[in-house]
Regions:
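Helix-loop-helix hairpin linking two adjacent transmembrane segments in secondary transporters
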Residues: 1-37
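Multi-pass alpha-helical transporter architecture, strongest
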Residues: 34-41, 156-163, 282-309
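Flexible cytoplasmic inter-helical loops of multi-pass small-molecule transporters
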Residues: 39-62, 301-310
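Extracytoplasmic gate region of multi-pass secondary transporters
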Residues: 70-121, 157, 224, 255-260
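Cytoplasmic membrane-interface "Motif A"-like loop-to-helix N-cap segments
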Residues: 135-146
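Low-complexity, proline/glycine-enriched hydrophobic segments characteristic of transmembrane helices
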Residues: 154-211
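Intracellular juxtamembrane helix-capping segments at the cytosolic ends
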Residues: 222-235
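A late C-terminal transmembrane helix in Major Facilitator Superfamily
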Residues: 234, 238-270
């Protein structure tokens, strides 16, 4: 919304020259608020009780990543949940925006409006699927998101092309010799059947495009809603924060964060406008297989029982 507002307040040239810096500057407000909240946050009751009882880990990094049972949980959580969550969420937001602007030649302002509307419509479903996972479980809801993404990404993006109104048949790439940046030029066919550079989409079907992005947002909600509860329930409190940080941040920062670059590279190398989707589909497939076989259902786990059980078995419990 901030980017959209900035684009509306500036011309295209102004935004390209200096306007793009405004959202980054405004983000300092959010950083300040987040920092303030973090300073005032208290530890969870269970961790406070464990800390008071002297049951915390002296070396959480060592215990989390060198003790095999804990490392096994980390790896299963990464490949069986977080990696798929990362690419599914990034596809719904960032890759969809790249596809609209770069491949389908939809006006940047219009593209941002489409993405913003889809995200606004999808926001309540993050809570809905989180609550649903409290009733039916986490694992298979997350696996369903992976399966639906694998099966539907190509059809969805084909329909996005139809809705945009540009008959894009291929893309060609050029590389800036100075910076190494890859630029994509989409091509369509003219009346004689010759391939020509595509013009900006003149009359995109905005409601249909919003709906198609909303569907992708639903997939993201299906896996993102339950994953926070799953990660908390998957690790013991004494090393929980350290342990869940690795799969979550690698899943989002690496697997998800590399999606735009890998998607762009695949399209550039192949000329196939759908090739960029192969990467999130493959990662989602890995998560589907690994999660289905190895992920334990944590629904119903009473995380405070960990303290009670440890306290009962402690020689100083009496």
């Amino acid at each position: 919304m901030v980017i959209l507002g900035t684009q509306s307040a500036t011309t295209r040239e102004q935004f390209a020259n200096w306007g793009w810096r405004i959202p980054f500057l405004l983000s300092m407000i959010l950083v300040s608020i987040s920092f303030y909240i973090r300073l005032r946050m208290r530890e969870s009751p269970i961790f406070s009780r464990i800390k008071a009882s002297g049951m915390t880990s002296a070396k959480p990094l060592t215990e989390a990543f060198t003790v095999w049972p804990n490392l096994k949980r980390v790896l299963i959580s990464l490949f069986g949940a977080a990696a798929g969550q990362g690419v599914i969420c990034y596809t719904a937001q960032f890759y969809a925006l790249f596809y609209l602007q770069t491949i389908l030649k939809v006006n940047p302002k219009t593209s941002n409006i489409i993405v913003a509307l889809a995200l606004l419509l999808g926001m309540p479903f993050f809570t809905l699927f989180g609550a649903l996972s409290d009733r039916i479980g986490r694992k298979w809801l997350m696996m369903a998101a992976c399966l639906l993404s694998i099966l539907s990404y190509i059809p969805i993006y084909k329909q996005m092309q139809v809705a945009a109104g540009n008959n894009i048949v291929t893309v060609r790439s050029t590389t800036n010799k100075l910076t190494g940046a890859i630029n994509l030029t989409p091509f369509t066919t003219d009346a004689t059947g010759q391939q020509v550079p595509a013009e900006e989409a003149s009359n995109p079907n905005i409601p249909m495009l919003v709906f198609l992005l909303f569907v992708q947002t639903i997939f993201a909600c299906m896996i993102y809603g339950p994953i926070a509860a799953y990660l908390v329930e998957a690790f013991p409190a004494r090393i929980r924060y350290t342990s869940l940080s690795l799969p979550y941040h690698i899943g989002n920062g690496v697997f998800g964060g590399l999606l735009p670059l890998i998607g762009l590279t695949l399209c550039a190398r192949t000329g196939n406008i759908y090739a960029g989707l192969y990467y999130p589909m493959i990662v989602a497939a890995i998560t589907l297989v690994a999660g289905s076989l190895l992920l334990k259902e944590t629904y119903g786990t009473l995380i405070w029982d960990e303290y009670n059980q440890a306290n009962q078995t402690s020689p100083t419990a009496d």
